[in-house]
Every structure is written in structure tokens, then in C-alpha cells.
Amino acid sequence: MSFPGWGPYPPVERDETSAITYSSKLHGSVTVRDPYSQLEVPFEDSEETKAFVHSQRKFARTYLDENPDREAWLETLKKSWNYRRFSALKPESDGHYYFEYNDGLQSQLSLYRVRMGEEDTVLTESGPGGELFFNPNLLSLDGNAALTGFVMSPCGNYWAYGVSEHGSDWMSIYVRKTSSPHLPSQERGKDPGRMNDKIRHVRFFIVSWTSDSKGFFYSRYPPEDDEGKGNAPAMNCMVYYHRIGEDQESDVLVHEDPEHPFWISSVQLTPSGRYILFAASRDASHTQLVKIADLHENDIGTNMKWKNLHDPWEARFTIVGDEGSKIYFMTNLKAKNYKVATFDANHPDEGLTTLIAEDPNAFLVSASIHAQDKLLLVYLRNASHEIHIRDLTTGKPLGRIFEDLLGQFMVSGRRQDNDIFVLFSSFLSPGTVYRYTFGEEKGHSSLFRAISIPGLNLDDFMTESVFYPSKDGTSVHMFITRPKDVLLDGTSPVLQYGYGGFSLAMLPTFSLSTLLFCKIYRAIYAIPNIRGGSEYGESWHREGMLDKKQNVFDDFNAATEWLIANKYASKDRIAIRGGSNGGVLTTACANQAPGLYRCVITIEGIIDMLRFPKFTFGASWRSEYGDPEDPEDFDFIFKYSPYHNIPPPGDTIMPAMLFFTAAYDDRVSPLHTFKHVAALQHNFPKGPNPCLMRIDLNSGHFAGKSTQEMLEETADEYSFIGKSMGLTMQTQGSVDSSRWSCVTV
């Protein structure tokens, strides 16, 4: 059998002697071969890894660039992406509303502001309006600097913000005065106007200002020479307090715990600034060690007197608000779907009092206080959001708002304001901002602004909900989006997306590129709400984790089988897609049911399930996947681990496979993709379908990529899928973006 026209694959050394011995409850000592362990050495530290990366990049680039549809897709995406989009307005303590805005093809969203009372002047046909406050596109020459978070001081004079480069989890925190906005004419590659404060060694933007606005608390790690590079696990998280205007070396240590190097520590402050909540997380589970202190009675430092909020490792707590000594929390204490409870800091022995009981059929996503005494609750029910309002004092239901909208909501507002802004989006809604005003008896809502995409008629598409049986008989929900005129005759191509883990729900989310895929290829887009997510509460999550992880793969495969049986899909034209934890899904499904799929897209996936705890944040994922060094856990992990369960050479035909990874991904190390692709290419060197790896040398885990880079990736992905499934681009498919794309009411 000769090599396909695009072969052979680049050579890579295979060490048949490399192996690791594990303890198994069922089999005792088990020796597991790891012939590509040398690829665990980071790109910048190994000539072998570097040579592997460069040869694979060249090989994949040659194949992808030879596809004529690639340039057609890129041109279509560029034209279609040139529409204006924005966020809801967020009130801040300096008397302004802030909102994010992109005029089309900017690399990153910019931040604008407008004085309260003048908000009707923004986002009109003449442009964004208001005043440009911060433009991250000016921070770097290549557009790869990203704003990771920001929070304003209570006095409204200072603005703390995080900036990461090239998608790294590592960031620096800076401070600027709100009286020093960016200017449109500023030179790129600089950030003039910021103060001298620079906080380094930060991996999470968790910042809490003190009520006097003199400084803030933050979490950080010890100095490391290789921040943003390598596979070393993040260890020894600490909490510090930074005073404005001082060097980081003078910051005050609040907490450290060298005995538990993998724990992640952070603090929250109540809105009044009086109480500080300390929380330590030892893994990705919904449990923490939580303590509380009164800043009126303590000097900031390591000698603060903390009171236990509850027994450790039983629940997670998020501050909702406070009133005197009463603190409102959202918690899953004896409520796996979360509830709202109160705690009296003056009487800690009394424990928590439930204000809003857990809803057994819906997952509480967020809770916030508005109009002084109204509690706004966002629930996740049947894979979509609901907004309910309760009386803050009694918990009495006051009604549900936006009942007729099926999708997801983002709410912004403050307790002292009677108005909130709500951003709604769904598969067929790119974003609609509503203004809701609370009233004594009943509030009212009005349309504020809506994003529109000229030339793309969203009425040409439809989304439907179906239920299908999984392998064990469990009924699973699935969203299906398609052009209305696509016939259900068993000939349509399908792009199926999944995640299935970490309690992350797959909500109705707008994706212009996905709609273009459906339009141009006359295709169907399917998202099954498989177990492992929180679409149906925490129980749904638990049914897809640890020793029940196989349910996730069974649910996903069953969705594909249902689509074929019900003539939504052609059995020879099904592509699946997943990233990060979803990479476990796509690679496991490809191993277990290779004949079910024609094309598999895996983006920065976790794949070597026996080695994941050794790198980056992998140790914290053991609560989700199990611990490979635990004999009982080893047995169920080894059974599905994609890297260790690739079908052997023989008659198996694997789908066309395209892997995306980033050489400097410091969340999910690229070693997972490197090793898996090397093993696949070894087992199937002359298979009829290609196995390629697209390696980015300039980004990290999803975040921080410029618009241009994202469009380049999408063009590679969609043209690869099209070629693999024999699809023809029906039309240029771009939309006319020459007209204004905002509806004003």
C-alpha cells in the first residue's frame, strides 16, 4: 500500500523502552508504555521537541494551504466579521456607564464610557458615542495583548486592570486613574497614562479593593523565570495586599500555605468593605475551605483573626451582599444546585440561614441585589437561563422577567440603582441589550440596543430542541440549528460540538462562523447537552465525571446515531469538534467509534489521562477525572484515556483529524497533542485520511488571540472539514457589512 498523496508523515523518534508502572486495584502492577515521553520536554528546552514542532507545522501548513477553499473561507470570514458589536452598559463608581465595543475587525474589544444620564447618546447610527477609555489594541504591535479583567476603586478614581500577552494565563496588574483615558491617536505598543504600580506573578485576576480605595487584595505566585512557558505546575498561591503608589516588593502578605502547594487561595470583600472572605480551593470541585474576618477589627496581614464560616471542604461560597453584620451568600451547602443564605458575622455560631431554598430542577447561576431590596436570580433550567426576582428580606417571589426569551443572559447593575442592563443572546441572536426598571409593584423592560448583521437574515435559520436516548437509556437534550430550507433527507453534513465536564453548560450561544458554515455547506449544527455539564443541575455533572466519564462519550456517540437515524445527517458527512476538556471527548469518541465520524477537530485538548496531573494546573483536575496514581481511579481512567487507547494498526480506518494546539499553552500543555498525534501517525502511516497538527507559536489556551488569528484558524478548520467530507462551498456566503449594524430604539 502506497502513501497517500499528502504523505509520508514527518519522522519522530519512538522509544519502545519508555514505560511507567502504575498500581491497579484489579490487576496489581501495570506497566504502561509511553513511547513519546520525550515530547513532554517543553518546546524551548528541547531540540527534539522543537524539531518535531517545526516539521509538523510545515507538514500541516502545506496540506492546509493547498486547499483552494481555504482562501475562499478566509475572505468570506473577513467580510462577514466586519460588523459592530458591543456589551451591556455597566455602571461604575466614577459616575459613568462602561461598555465594550468593536467596530468590526479590531483585534480586541475596546472599553468606552458615558456619563450616567447620557446613555441614550451611545451606540447610535453615528458610532459608539461616549468616550474611549481603554483600547487594548494599542498595548502591542501584533494585537496579542488582552485585557483579562478590571475593577474600579470605590471612590471612582482608580482602575485596576490585568493584561496578558499571547493568550498566557500569566498576567500583570496595572493601575491607572480614571481621569487618564486612552487617546485614539496613541502610539501602538505603549500604555501611556497608567501609574507606576505593576503587579507580577499573577495567574488569576481576583482583585478586591478596600473601602478606603487605598489598595486592593490579589492572588499571586512566587517569582518564576519561566512564567508563560513550560509545563511546570503552578504552586504555592499566596494572597497579598497592595497599596496604591508603592512597589510590589512592599506589598503585605495576607496568606500563604506551603504545606498545600497546589491549593489556590483568594479573597472577596463584601460591598460595604467591612468583611473579608478567604477561600482556598484544592481542586476543581465545588468545595472550599472558607474563613471570614472583620476589617474593622483587624490590621491587614498574616495575623488577622479569622472565623470559620463552616466546616471545610463541604461547600463553596460567593458573596452576594451585606447589610450591617448580615452577609448574603450564594452557596451549595446542603444544596447541590445552590441556594441563597445569610450569615450573621456577630453571631457566627448560629451558622447560615436559608433565604432562597435550592431549586431541585434548576441550577442557580448567579445572585445579585438591585433597587435596594430586590434579589435577582439567574437559573439554568433545561439548558437555558431564567431570571427570577425575589424580595431580599422575605424571599417572597416577585415574578420572572424575559420569560419569552430562550438563551442566556448577562446582568449588570448595582444595588443602589433602580435600573439594570441585561444582555441576551442565543444561537440566532448576536446580542440584544434590554433596560429593566424595578418598580414598587411591577417593573418594566425596554429594548436599549440590538446588534444586527447586515446581509445575514437570521430568519433563514431555525433552532429546535430534541431529546434522544443514550446507551443506558438516559434521555439527553440536544440543540439543532440549521437553515430552514435544509431538507431532513439524510444527505446533510453535520458539525457536532460537545464538552461534557466541569459542570460547564453548553448554552445557546451565537456564533457567526457556525451560521456561515451551515449556510455555505447547507449543513446542520448540533450541540448535545451531554452529561458532565450542569444543564440539568449538579447531578447531571456528577453523572459524567470520575468513574462515570464513559457516560459522556456514550451520550455524544448516541447523539450522532440519533441524527443519522432521524435523517438529519448523512452517515458519511459528520464532523465533531471539541476543545480543552472537550478534547478528551473528541479523541475518545474517535477511538471508540472511528467509523461513526468522517472528521474530528480537537482544540488544545487534554488527552494523556495518566500524566495530566503532572503539568500546569492538571493536579486540580483530579476531582473531575480521578487520580491515576490511585489504584481504583487508575482502572477507569486507563480504560478510556485517548492516548492509551488508539486502535492498533490493522483494518481500522480513522477519521480525518485536525488538532489545534499552542506551543506556549500554560493551561493545557501541548504535550498532550504532541504525543497523541505522534502515536496516531505511527499507527496509521498510510491511512486514507490525514492526521494533522496546527501549532501556534504565538498564543496560549484560547484567550488573547487577535481577530485575524481567529479567522485564520477558522478558515483552516472549515476548509479541512469541507475537503475531508467532500463538501462544496455553495456561495461566497459573506454578508454585506457596508451598512450600520446596530438597531436603536
Swiss-Prot record:
Record flagged with keyword Transferase: no
GO cellular-component term (any): cytosol
Catalytic residues, chain numbering: S580 (charge relay system), D665 (charge relay system), H701 (charge relay system)
GO molecular-function terms, A-Z: oligopeptidase activity; serine-type endopeptidase activity
Catalytic activity, EC: 3.4.21.26
UniProt cross-references to InterPro entries, sorted A to Z: AB_hydrolase_fold, Pept_S9_AS, Pept_S9A_N, Peptidase_S9_cat, Peptidase_S9A, Prolyl_oligopep/macrocyclase
Role played: Prolyl oligopeptidase; part of the gene cluster that mediates the biosynthesis of omphalotin A, a highly methylated cyclic dodecapeptide with nematodicidal activity. Excises and catalyzes the macrocyclization of the methylated core peptide of OphMA to yield omphalotin A. OphP works in a two-step fashion with an initial cleavage at the N-terminus, followed by a second cleavage at the C-terminus of the core peptide.
UniProt subunit comment: Monomer.
Family designation: Belongs to the peptidase S9A family.
Protein name from the UniProt record: Prolyl oligopeptidase ophP
Organism of provenance: Omphalotus olearius (Jack o'lantern)
Gene: ophP
